[in-house]
Amino acid sequence: MYAYFRGTLISFTADEAIIELQGVAYHFLISATTSRQLPNSGSEVQLFAHLYVREDAMLLYGFYSEEERQLFRLLLQASGVGPKLALSVLSGLPVHEVHDAIVSNIPERLYGISGVGKKTAARIILELRDKILKLSPVLPTATARRPHNAAQQLRDDAITALVTLGFPRAAAQKTVTSLLDENSNCTVEEVVKSALLLIHNAQL
């Protein structure tokens, strides 16, 4: 019914986001993966949407990428997997790692995700492997995605660490982006240390 929503990000947490569009505020349930990629509140943002309808409620799920939405919809096709568990899977692993776990028949990668035990992991792989292969152009493998995702994950982790330390997200994003533009071959710890030094000097 809905392809995506583009509007002003009013607020968000690790599992929820509110977007205002033409005077109407929409509440989205999101994964931790999407939450880590959202900009500051007050910024314009676009979320790919999935409307889930049940007898007592209509729920909007939002995704930062079309890939994540496609995988969410695929997970819903597995027996015993509802929106809550599907979102938990997407919060526990990056999209390409979930894809590879299913395609390569490695249920161990799904263990440890909240709500996913051995039987559930095995069932997801058994029921979805053939289906996910048809989505491979939309959901590329880790090999194809690794360079981009490694850099993106490094950036996201560094920004999250700085925000956790109390720095404004905007300042953290700007500083981390600048540092990685200069040198992308570094660890999260190195980026955070350099960022802390830059932010400290800027405040002097």
From Swiss-Prot:
Q: Which stretches of sequence are listed as region Domain II? A: 65-143
Main location as per UniProt: cytoplasm
The terms under GO molecular function for this entry are: ATP binding; four-way junction DNA binding; four-way junction helicase activity
Record localization:
Cytoplasm
CDD domains listed in its UniProt record: UBA_RuvA_C
Q: Where is this region: Domain III?
A: 150-204
> Where are the residues of the annotated region Flexible linker?
144-149
The keyword Membrane appears for this protein = no
Mind listing the UniProt keywords for this protein, alphabetically? Answer: Cytoplasm, DNA damage, DNA recombination, DNA repair, DNA-binding
The keyword DNA repair is assigned to this record: yes
> What is a biological process (GO) this protein takes part in?
DNA repair
Q: Which NCBIfam families match?
A: ruvA
What note about domains is in the entry? Has three domains with a flexible linker between the domains II and III and assumes an 'L' shape. Domain III is highly mobile and contacts RuvB.
What does this protein's UniProt record list under function? The RuvA-RuvB-RuvC complex processes Holliday junction (HJ) DNA during genetic recombination and DNA repair, while the RuvA-RuvB complex plays an important role in the rescue of blocked DNA replication forks via replication fork reversal (RFR). RuvA specifically binds to HJ cruciform DNA, conferring on it an open structure. The RuvB hexamer acts as an ATP-dependent pump, pulling dsDNA into and through the RuvAB complex. HJ branch migration allows RuvC to scan DNA until it finds its consensus sequence, where it cleaves and resolves the cruciform DNA.
The name this protein goes by in its record: Holliday junction branch migration complex subunit RuvA
UniProt source species: Chlorobium chlorochromatii (strain CaD3)
Q: Which gene encodes it?
A: ruvA
